[in-house]
Amino acid sequence: MYTFSGSKPTQLYMDILSTVIKEGDVLAPRGKRIKEIRPVMIEFKNPIRRTTFLKGRNINPFFQVAESLWILAGRSDVGFLLDYNKNMGQFSDDGVFFNAPYGERLRFWNRSDANNFIYNPLDQLRDVYEKIKADPDTRQAVAVIYNPLFDNINNDTKDRPCNLLLSFKLRNGKLDLSVYNRSNDLHWGTFGANLCQFSTILEAMATWLGVEVGSYYQITDSLHVYLDDYGAKITEDIQKVYGVNLETDEAPVVEDFEELLDPNPRMSYTMNELNQFLNEYFGIVDSLMRDDETYMHDGDCAQMLLNQIRHEPDEYIKVTLLLMVAKQALNRGMKDTVATAMNWIPLCEIKVSALRFLYKSYPEYINQYDLDEKLMKYIRREE
């Protein structure tokens, strides 16, 4: 078994990539060549740090936070995610719903919008919360994603879940989360989505319980990179930027800027408060945020929306919403609204990732920042 452990996710990313390239077996499931190591356990010792800074790897942080909010709300709709990542529609069978959305599985187990099915839906996250509240030492705080009813071979779908099960343990005053996974693409799964998704769920649950965040463990039976498509170019770009051949060279030490950045914004909402916020957001605010009219007329409505968000009491939610407004404004070429939203975000990891994403579109705005030269080189992609 391969094991990796650390508190610096960027270095973990590089170390794991190096191991996959050096030691992975070449296979071709569905006719697509991969290099694979298995089984693998990754321990993220400080999962509040959910942003990575590998040069040569450009991650969409706007999508990461929007998808995490979408999961917490138990959503299954494709349309919401398309505003933050236009490629997500390829994983839906009908272009309307996903077959195996993590949020719907976790918060409305036994409901499937894609399959027009509902039978006594269960909020598994509330079940986990109640079990730990009743018995802090419990070993029964489990939430299941894989559902044979919809994920069997006879359901011809593009979307079967890679992540299967979540297991929470409260130990020594800290909440740990272990996620069990059948298949994990290193670039698009582990570090492109899962670290952000599941560390956010872990932080939410720890906040509801009033305990500290512990470790996040990702246990997978196939950790891989693609050799010809999907993430193949990402692997090539990373090796080129760092001047290494990971088949023969040692993994380099990589920069993560920890000492230059403010602490990441933290959640504060209780479970009931977050549920109320999510109901209000998706019931009222989301349609306003995604409406073209909001960003017209010199952006007056967008400015009003930003002013409301600025007074959001939960710092994590506030930063998430500011990033979402910035992406909506970016989609419509509203530079001033993008700048206003970004200026109200503290200089934390997710902001640096967002500035890097924005640089090609708005270099003149980004260059106004007076930041450490190492940060500015990363943001400008001077690699």
UniProtKB/Swiss-Prot annotation:
Keyword Protein biosynthesis tagged: no
Assigned keywords, A-Z: Host-virus interaction, Inhibition of host innate immune response by virus, Methyltransferase, Restriction-modification system evasion by virus, Transferase, Viral immunoevasion
Active site: C162
Chemical reaction(s) catalysed: dUMP + (6R)-5,10-methylene-5,6,7,8-tetrahydrofolate + H2O = 5-hydroxymethyl-dUMP + (6S)-5,6,7,8-tetrahydrofolate
An example Gene Ontology biological process: symbiont-mediated evasion of host restriction-modification system
Gene Ontology molecular function: any one: hydroxymethyl-, formyl- and related transferase activity
Superkingdom as given in the UniProt entry: Viruses
Similarity comment: family membership: Belongs to the thymidylate synthase family.
Described purpose of this protein according to its UniProt entry: Catalyzes formation of 5-hydroxymethyldeoxyuridylate (5HMdUMP) as a step in the pathway that replaces dTMP by thymidine hypermodifications in the viral genome. As a final result of the pathway of hypermodification, hydroxymethyluracil substitutes for a subset of thymidines in the viral DNA. These modifications probably prevent degradation of viral DNA by the host restriction-modification antiviral defense system.
Protein name: Deoxyuridylate hydroxymethyltransferase
